[in-house]
Amino acid sequence: MRRNNRFLGLSGVAMVLFLFLLFPCLYAQDAIPALSRPLEPLRIPGETKEMHRGMRLITVHDSLPASFTHSLDNVIEDESRSLSPFFQKLNDMTGPVRIVHIGDSHVRGHLYPLITRRCLEHDFGAEAVYPDTISYRTEGLAHETGEPGIVYHMLGINGATSVTFSDDEKIKKIASLHPDLIIVSFGTNEAHSRRYLAQAHKMQIGRLLGMLKAACPEAFFLLTTPPGAYVGRRRARTINPRTVTAARIIKEYAQEHKMAVWDMYNIVGGKTDACRNWTKHHMFRADGIHFTPDGYRLQGNLDRKST
């Protein structure tokens, strides 16, 4: 039965490890807009026949509201098949499979990555961690039992950029968790600076990833792009024009270094519609940067299904 459950779970993961409305415990207080058409099963580059058989056992629906304009297919881009060994490890599940999600306040708030974590635990087993209650006030580290299953750690810092985590102590902390997969979610705060420079941003990503690779040589990586944000004072707020460049730089880095990327920014509408889509569904908080619980639930749902 556990083996079958793993196949079912893999099909769910194969549809976004990365950004959430499938289970009753995740329902928002306010109704989420109607869902659009079902997605075709996501093809993971290099998937085994055994993995694909499992994917056919479950139907996964697109959780983007049908009225989200200029949205793209919710997939992880991984032409080099860099995540295939990780997905195989999920399928085998002979011990704990450890995921460390690092990022800015979107990760620090815990809601979006927590939904991803709970869904993965549902699909692959929660026996690897002790039951816990996670809120904004608690830490986001899971506590292992030693049993097989998903171990999902959340390490977010308010205002963080990739430079924030390019620190020996933070790298040591991440390495001490023995990650199989590291999810890297930055870009919002880099793009918020008026002095943003694309080339400097790429160099900063490279420094962080270089440190992580050296400290965690067995880990695989998934980069994500930011969801979009506004800048300026409340009554004169405009869509941040630098986010499109920041998202492009993250995606370029991933492609150049044969890493997987989940391009949330363009999936939810990109330059023309990402912020407008979030806004018309009242998913932004008043600051135009952070999101309501509904907004983070949707991101978490997307993240889980893209995987």
Label for each model-derived stretch:
Residues E79-F86, R108, Y112, T116, ...:
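Stable alpha-helical elements in mature extracytoplasmic
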Residues M1-L39:
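Bacterial Sec-dependent N-terminal signal peptides
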Residues F165, D180-I182, A191-Q255, A274, ...:
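Catalytic cores of extracellular degradative/oxidative enzymes
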Residues R98-H101, H106-M203, R207, A214:
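Conserved SGNH/GDSL esterase-like catalytic core that processes O-acyl groups on lipids
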Residues A31, S63, S71-V75, E79, ...:
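Coil residues (strongly favoring Ser/Thr
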Residues D92-V97:
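A short, charged/proline- and glycine-enriched loop
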Residues P38, L42-E47, H52-R56, V60-T69:
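Eukaryotic extended interaction platforms
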Residues D30, P226-S306:
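Catalytic His-Asp segment of secreted/periplasmic serine-dependent ester chemistry enzymes
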